[in-house]
Regions:
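Active-site cofactor/substrate anionic-group-binding motifs, chiefly glycine-
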Residues: 44-45, 49-97
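Positively charged, low-complexity intrinsically disordered leader regions
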Residues: 1-58, 62
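Anion-binding alpha/beta catalytic cores of soluble intermediary-metabolism enzymes, centered on
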Residues: 91-94, 99-170
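Short, structured coil segments at secondary-structure junctions
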Residues: 67, 97, 117-119, 174, ...
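Short, acidic/turn-prone active-site loops that include or flank metal/cofactor-
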Residues: 76-79, 126-130, 183-186
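Active-site-proximal loop->helix
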Residues: 72-94, 117, 169-170, 187-199
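Glycine-rich phosphate/diphosphate-binding loop of Rossmann-like nucleotide-binding domains
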Residues: 50-62, 144-219
Length: 219
């Protein structure tokens, strides 16, 4: 059976994201009503952190526990990952003893190599190239508060980093637009951003383009 990973935003289809949002609404309703809901009972999430984090660790660890599962925290300082063990070997061992793996690391190549040797799904908790879980949460919040994001416009001001790259992928999946304003030398790189279809973004000169960029934006 093909293992489904979430390494960058475009790994999931629009239909799959809609299903996730429907389940999210159900889980939130049950949680607010103090109704136990443990679909992940006896399941284990391994969280591998090469880059430090507060919110990512808290959200994943609390989330898996609220759904009945358990979380194991690993970092490169106290595991073989920091002592030169090949990523592929680590993936085979860790995935034998877990049901799900989340990795927060530097290079996208590392998480892709891990996923290629893993027996269980792998989630990108952040890399230098992408931050899919962050934008997944952002879009769910927008839809929850304002309705459909289709056809809307998002403003991005700053360098074309991992978050920007992920917004651009999300725009292609959800069919909205992104107005991007970056400092000189930090413009969008379509290949690095992993764009695969019709462009859903427009670039504005920084800093003078920021005001024009933000006009009529929805987020």
């Amino acid at each position: 059976m093909l293992i489904k990973h979430f390494l960058q935003f475009k790994d999931l289809s629009l239909a799959e994201f809609k299903h996730i949002f429907e389940r999210t609404l159900l889980i939130k309703q049950r949680f607010k009503a103090y109704q136990p809901y443990h679909p992940l009972s006896d399941r284990t999430l391994v969280m591998i952190f090469e880059k430090n984090s507060t919110r990512t660790r808290l959200s994943f660890e609390a989330g898996i526990q609220q759904l009945g599962g358990n979380a194991i925290y690993l970092n490169t300082r106290d595991s073989q990952l920091g002592r030169g063990e090949p990523v592929e070997d680590a993936a085979q061992v860790i995935s034998r003893m877990s049901d799900l793996v989340m990795i927060r690391t530097f290079e996208q190549e590392i998480i892709e190599r891990f996923a290629a040797s893993s027996r269980v799904p792998v989630i990108n908790g952040l890399t230098n190239e992408y931050h899919p879980c962050q934008i997944l949460a952002d879009i769910y919040t927008y839809i929850e508060q304002r309705g459909s994001i289709k056809g809307k416009t998002v403003a991005w001001i700053g360098d074309s980093n991992n978050v920007c790259n992920t917004w651009l992928q999300a725009a292609e999946v959800f069919d909205f637009n992104v107005h991007v304003s970056t400092p000189p030398g930090y413009e969008v790189e379509p290949e690095r951003a992993g764009l695969f279809g019709e462009n859903h973004y427009e670039e504005f000169a920084n800093p003078y383009g920021c005001r024009a960029q933000c006009r009529s934006c929805d987020h």
